[in-house]
């Protein structure tokens, strides 16, 4: 074997692979894994002399390793001698340095398609290589003209597909969507896969995975105003209310939460919003049964609150209109529809956009609770996000009351106030004792969470447009101290005495 020009680690690894090939020895996983780390960090192991126009077939490293690895993978006992699949990982690390044309010169198309149906490690490797080369015209042509995508999606929707394969498929689809690849419209959203999609949509065991898949495509669908079949994202009444699988119902609710997030981010497709409105209304009706339904209260209510949270912060006109219905028509925030002994109701009031609620409703709620009680404190913090509500709260935010709060509550309050111009101004100009005692000349705090709350508050104040007046320098100094520490020459020397009787 001619190892001239090959580094010593590569020689050692190749010798080991040959020994395995000839004697069916068990693969030394540690040796291979350590070598893979070297390979990933050093391209020159494969390409010691860069030759941009050179053929991959003439590369000595490739000509040594690829045939040996192929022989091992095709061996009758491969999966017994390499239970951790490290040889596949080695091949993956090598091929990661090659473009799709070079890979195809080493492996025929049949190998790629067959590999997608084989061992999960090989399948993941192939999908990863396709994703890494997704911008290549050759890869796009492979997707358009071969059965590669058919094979990938068929495996994805199989009931027992391993999570690592599912993850790699989803990364590939996300990459194609992020690139706005023509493959999305010509293949993934074409009628070609309709039978596959319909089968997955109508299969109880595959439905959750199908909804996850639709979410992956949704940015492209929204931006391109693509007309997606309604039944792909609209769930029927029976799928929610006649479903005994609690976890599945939770995932259905989470689907709508994620769908609204995508609508808020990528576009205001009015057809999709119009079509999901009945589902959202059903969720609200479902939520209103929480007081008398333990399943709804324990498993569904908090996720429905997440849906309402994303609706409340939407800037999409049709969702804004729907939000008005949530507040007005469904009277969700009327005192007789709120149960503040339930965690889900506290979460609702702690997350729902306070600017999307009429002032009189919030005033009624705040009159019903002790805002400085630990249980309801998150509601107070949320309400500060509305200037109108904050102005109503000012008489209750007195120095004496705030000064009695625990440090975690106090600094959580100051951090929240530091996030908005109107509350920053009140903090700086209307609460001098609080600024002096807890921000300009703060007490020493060692607990990490409180320390971070204080630091973030100082940062918000310093990097805002608010005039800090006389507080700028002490706040700036304190922030610098928290970020960089105290200079050695500024530390007063002292000796700790363990026994006070010696003092």
UniProtKB/Swiss-Prot annotation:
Query: What CDD domains does UniProt report for this protein, alphabetically?
Result: Hsm3_like
List where in the cell it is found: Cytoplasm
- Keyword line: Chaperone, Cytoplasm, DNA damage, DNA repair
- Output the Pfam families linked to this UniProt entry: HSM3_C (PF18794), HSM3_N (PF18795)
- Protein name, as recorded: DNA mismatch repair protein HSM3
Q: Which gene encodes it?
A: HSM3
Report if keyword Chaperone is assigned: yes
Q: Which family does it belong to?
A: Belongs to the proteasome subunit S5B/HSM3 family.
GO cellular-component terms in the record? Answer: cytoplasm
Q: What does this protein do?
A: Involved in DNA mismatch repair in slow-growing cells. Acts as a chaperone during the assembly of the 26S proteasome, specifically of the base subcomplex of the 19S regulatory complex (RC).
Question: What GO biological process, any one, is recorded here?
Answer: DNA repair
Q: Tell me the organism's taxonomic lineage.
A: Eukaryota, Fungi, Dikarya, Ascomycota, Saccharomycotina
Question: Which parts of the chain are coiled coil?
Answer: none
């Amino acid at each position: 074997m001619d190892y001239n020009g090959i580094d010593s680690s590569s020689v050692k690894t190749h010798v080991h692979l040959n020994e395995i090939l000839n004697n069916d020895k068990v693969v030394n996983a540690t040796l291979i894994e350590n070598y893979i780390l070297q390979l990933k960090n050093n391209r020159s192991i494969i390409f010691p002399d860069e030759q941009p126009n050179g053929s991959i077939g003439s590369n000595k490293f490739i000509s040594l390793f690829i045939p040996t690895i192929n022989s091992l993978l095709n061996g009758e006992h491969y999966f017994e001698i390499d239970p951790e699949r490290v040889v596949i990982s080695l091949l993956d690390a090598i091929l990661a340095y090659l473009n799709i044309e070079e890979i195809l010169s080493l492996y025929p198309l049949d190998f790629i398609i067959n590999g997608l149906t084989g061992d999960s490690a090989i399948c993941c490797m192939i999908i990863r290589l396709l994703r890494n080369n997704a911008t290549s015209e050759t890869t796009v042509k492979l997707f358009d003209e071969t059965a590669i995508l058919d094979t990938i999606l068929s495996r994805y929707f199989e009931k027992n597909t391993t999570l690592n394969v599912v993850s790699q498929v989803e990364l590939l689809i996300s990459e194609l969507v992020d690139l706005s690849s023509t493959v999305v419209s010509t293949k993934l959203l074409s009628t070609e896969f309709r039978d596959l999609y319909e089968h997955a949509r109508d299969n109880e065991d595959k439905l959750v995975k199908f909804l996850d898949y639709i979410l992956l495509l949704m940015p492209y669908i929204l931006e391109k105003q693509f007309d997606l079949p309604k039944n792909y994202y609209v769930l029927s009444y029976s799928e929610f209310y006649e479903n005994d699988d609690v976890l599945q119902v939770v995932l259905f609710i989470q689907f709508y939460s994620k769908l609204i997030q995508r609508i808020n981010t990528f576009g205001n497709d009015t057809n999709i919003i119009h079509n999901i409105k009945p589902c959202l209304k059903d969720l609200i009706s479902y939520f209103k049964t929480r007081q008398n339904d333990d399943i709804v209260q324990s498993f569904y209510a908090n996720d429905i609150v997440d849906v309402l949270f994303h609706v409340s912060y939407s800037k999409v006109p049709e969702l804004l209109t729907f939000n008005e219905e949530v507040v007005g028509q469904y009277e969700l925030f009327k005192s007789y529809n709120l149960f503040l002994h339930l965690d889900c109701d506290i979460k609702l009031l702690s997350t729902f956009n306070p600017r999307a609620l009429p002032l009189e409703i919030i005033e009624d709620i705040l009159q019903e609770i002790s805002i400085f009680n630990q249980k309801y404190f998150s509601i107070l913090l949320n309400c500060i996000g509305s200037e109108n509500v904050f102005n109503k709260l000012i008489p209750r935010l007195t120095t004496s009351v705030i000064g009695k709060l625990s440090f975690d509550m106090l600094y959580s309050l100051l951090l929240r106030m530091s996030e908005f111009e109107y509350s920053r101004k009140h903090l700086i100009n209307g609460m001098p004792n609080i600024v002096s005692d807890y921000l300009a000349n703060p007490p020493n705090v060692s607990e990490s969470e409180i320390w971070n709350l204080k630091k973030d508050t100082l940062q918000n104040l310093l990097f805002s447009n608010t005039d800090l007046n006389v507080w700028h320098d002490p706040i700036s100094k304190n922030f610098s101290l928290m970020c960089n520490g105290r200079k050695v020459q500024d530390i007063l020397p002292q000796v700790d005495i363990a026994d006070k009787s010696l003092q």
